[in-house]
Curated annotation (Swiss-Prot):
This is Exosome complex component Rrp42. Belongs to the RNase PH family. Rrp42 subfamily. Keywords: Cytoplasm, Exosome. It holds the Pfam family RNase_PH. The gene is rrp42. It comes from Aeropyrum pernix (strain ATCC 700893 / DSM 11879 / JCM 9820 / NBRC 100138 / K1). GO terms for molecular function: mRNA 3'-UTR AU-rich region binding.
Length: 276
């Protein structure tokens, strides 16, 4: 079942003032400075029946990702490419504000930001997913499950997605005399071909202060957030603004600068997670 979150509660003025008093000193809860993301832990191979799976802990935020592969037809406009789709579910146990129901704009936005980031850099070699050109290709479904929401779902979900793609293996298959593709349940097939790695880094503006990787309370007191997609070569490949506040040119430059630095932390965590 898909899950939809309700609107997060507005933080009381006293909470915002408490955060501002810390920010004026250059600090945040958890002994972080403004530019430092929370601790990142990535565990792969947690779901036996998935082609790839991972659990990401970004502070107290936890996201599980899994990828399954099936055989299907390619899109008519891309007959020589496989198919990759991303879906996100907000599990009710993750937050008291999440309730059962169809995905709303927040879940859809999360999945689309992850999906667009992958497509912008051509993260997965979709041509390598072709089984029979124009007829049969691998269809990959990446499912994201938010199981503990303590802020910054974008970065945790993007890390989880990259972790599963980097460790996934396609199933083995055989082709029958009639042309039917038969997937074998025994043994592992080829590794998924990932051409480029990409992460997102979320920054938030609270009054005049810019912070990296906001927790749930910082999100509640923030005026606006910017999600910056960065590839492994340090290129900015996507931007997504959320929230009703405004950003100056100087704000955006600061946010991008912070994001480029923080992305190095995320890429290092990914590299450590996929080491044999």
């Amino acid at each position: 079942m898909s899950i939809t979150p309700h609107r997060l509660p507005v933080a009381p003025v006293i909470v915002r003032e408490a955060y501002l008093s810390l920010l004026r000193k250059g600090w945040r809860p958890g002994d972080r400075d403004l530019k430092t993301p929370r601790n990142v832990k990535i565990e792969t191979g947690i779901i036996e029946k998935a082609e790839g799976s991972a659990l990401v802990k970004l502070g107290k935020t936890q996201v599980i990702a899994g990828v399954k592969a099936g055989v299907g037809a390619p899109f008519k406009d891309t007959p020589n490419q496989g198919v990759l789709t991303v879906h996100a579910e907000f599990v009710p146990l993750a937050s008291p504000v999440f309730e059962p129901g169809p995905p709303d704009e927040n879940a859809i936005e999360l999945a689309r930001v992850v999906d667009r980031s992958l497509r912008e850099v051509g993260a997965v070699d979709l041509e390598s997913l072709v089984i029979r050109p124009g007829e049969k290709v691998w269809v990959l479904w990446v499912d994201l499950y938010i199981i503990d929401h303590d802020g910054n779902l974008f970065d945790a979900s993007m890390l989880a997605t990259m972790a599963v793609l980097l460790t996934a293996r396609l199933p083995r298959y055989e082709e029958s005399e009639t042309g039917e593709i038969i997937i074998s349940k025994e043994g592992e097939g080829e590794e998924l071909k990932v051409k480029t790695r990409v992460v997102t880094v979320t920054t938030a503006k609270i009054d005049r202060y810019i912070v990296v990787d906001p927790n749930i309370e910082e999100e509640a007191v923030s005026d606006v957030r910017l999600v910056t997609a960065v590839d492994e070569n340090g290129r900015i490949v996507g931007l997504q603004k959320t929230g009703m506040g405004s950003l100056t040119e100087a704000d955006i430059e600061t946010m991008i600068g912070y994001s480029l630095e923080a992305s190095k932390v995320y890429f290092k965590a990914l590299e450590e997670a996929i080491k044999p």
